[in-house]
Amino acid sequence: MPELRSRTVTHGRNMAGARALMRASGVPGADIGRKPIIAVANSFTEFVPGHTHLAPVGRIVSEAVTAAGGIPREFNTIAVDDGIAMGHGGMLYSLPSRDLIADSVEYMVEAHCADALICISNCDKITPGMLNAALRLNIPTVFVSGGPMESGRATLVDGTVRTLDLVDAMSEAVNDKISDADILRIEENACPTCGSCSGMFTANSMNCLTEAIGLSLPGNGSVLATHTARKTLYENAARTVLDLTRRYYEQDDDSVLPRNIATPAAFGNAMALDIAMGGSTNTILHLLAAAQEAEVSYGLAEMDALSRSVPCLAKVAPNVAKDRTYYMEDVHRAGGIPALLGELHRGGLLNEDVHSVHSPSLADWLKTWDVRGGSPSKEAVELWHAAPGCVRSAEAFSQSERWDTLDEDAEGGCIRSVEHAYSKDGGLAVLRGNLAVDGCVVKTAGVDESIWTFEGPAVVCESQEEAVQKILTQQVKEGDVVVIRYEGPKGGPGMQEMLYPTSYLKGRGLGKACALVTDGRFSGGTSGLSIGHASPEAAAGGTIALVEDGDRIRIDIPNRSIELLVDDAELTRREQALNGVYAPKNRDRKVSAALKAYAAMATSADKGAVRDVSKLG
């Protein structure tokens, strides 16, 4: 039976100094050595609306840990707001922050010999960073996020009422047909509350995936940040981690450990969910990284196979259903992630050999929490009725509105059954060809089916900034393929998100008339024919470095291919002309020492853009 890790610092005469410091930090002497130490990894910051409300959350979780018999020790990680960092040099730091967050959690837990971990995350790189840390540490862990923002609603000057999200504010800003007065109303109402942005963007996608992989409680990905139900979720997460801690240290039950929950089968189920809900392409990057931390063999090949068999069952903003736009509050009303998992399970698309921090089996999980099947508990039914308050608020659990009815319409509602899927093909796809030998990814749920096959001339850009300039000065025309290179993990460095180029294409009316291909990545808010993660990246000698203006590129989503229509002899000539120097031309960019350190070990996106520590020797 394993001993508490904390015994290292709580037992023995030689640890009198450590115990003295614990007493000084507020731990009752009688608890030292008797109760498990629970690390509470918070990510509160005033920079990010998805995290501004997390200071009191840390206290709620800590108090619940104490009440459940543990010693809570809260600390904070950094948290970058991708929306604010977008479109300038700040975005270079976003993806590298994932590794810093993972390392900081590891450092704090290992330095202080914590017995278990609660991760209070929310936005884009924070959940993936903490997930990597949890799988690396492999101690009892529960994730609980800050929750999604409510969708926005604006009354325009002409009286029209629009539902909104952050991406609307970005794309409409370059639409010359919209007045300054309406732009201001959109800006003021696009993000009305605290929480992670209201669509199925990266933050919400990842918080939903922690549910599917089994490391968080039902509702983690969909209960609104403003709702009182979220407070109950925090308290339950604290009680759950104490239960897992006792099962591991007192009953020798290692099934509760993250690596025994996040198994290959669990990764497969999480990816099936991701494809079905049309999640952010960033999730592919983060799941690849997490699989490596879990020492699970799971890569693009497995993801590609699933993308051919799992249909699209939900279209949530920025993806648009034919009749309306859905947001996370609508996913919640339809039964949340358990409802999606239930539909996949009834379609025979999930592996049943999994368990979670809250249920011993998938069958038990769905029986209790899926309102569309089985016999859901009263607690589950109550949870899914939690509704938006429709009042501007930066405070957590500030409202307790409830839906009168749930959306259980599997034929025409937010979440569809396999028989009534939005499309037979899932919401994400992996493409391969001579332009991306090791693969690239596209969110098919956000692509109009009329352009699932596309061919056009390349407009080559050596940076995101050059692409933006060309789009805004009408150098990109209908039918073009915008190629943005040297924006990969190594070449950027940092693998920037290309939300501004895609938003500007949309704002200029080219969202269904152009394609964009890059070795960088996309925001979860991206829609359109936006193909990212081209691997190998340009800086690593990928074919994307050889593209020239006017080259024709053919994209075929149904057949999962992407081809640069230039013969091999010409590509060889171009490669020889580069003489082994793969670097952007005429790009003026300041790269700090911190970013250079990241670039020195960064792998391409098909490996999750993780650090290759073997390069350290």
From Swiss-Prot:
PROSITE patterns noted in UniProt: ILVD_EDD_1, ILVD_EDD_2
Q: List the disulfide bonds.
A: none
Question: What GO CC terms are in its UniProt record?
Answer: cytosol
- A Pfam family assignment: ILVD_EDD_N
Q: How is the cofactor bound?
A: Binds 1 [2Fe-2S] cluster per subunit. This cluster acts as a Lewis acid cofactor.
Question: Which keywords has UniProt assigned to this entry?
Answer: 2Fe-2S, Amino-acid biosynthesis, Branched-chain amino acid biosynthesis, Iron, Iron-sulfur, Lyase, Magnesium, Metal-binding
**EC annotation from Swiss-Prot or TrEMBL:** 4.2.1.9
Its recorded reaction(s) are: (2R)-2,3-dihydroxy-3-methylbutanoate = 3-methyl-2-oxobutanoate + H2O; (2R,3R)-2,3-dihydroxy-3-methylpentanoate = (S)-3-methyl-2-oxopentanoate + H2O
User: Which GO BP terms, alphabetically?
Assistant: isoleucine biosynthetic process; L-valine biosynthetic process
The entry's function note states:
Functions in the biosynthesis of branched-chain amino acids. Catalyzes the dehydration of (2R,3R)-2,3-dihydroxy-3-methylpentanoate (2,3-dihydroxy-3-methylvalerate) into 2-oxo-3-methylpentanoate (2-oxo-3-methylvalerate) and of (2R)-2,3-dihydroxy-3-methylbutanoate (2,3-dihydroxyisovalerate) into 2-oxo-3-methylbutanoate (2-oxoisovalerate), the penultimate precursor to L-isoleucine and L-valine, respectively.
Indicate what this protein is called per its UniProt record.
Answer: Dihydroxy-acid dehydratase
Query: Species name for this entry?
Result: Streptomyces coelicolor (strain ATCC BAA-471 / A3(2) / M145)
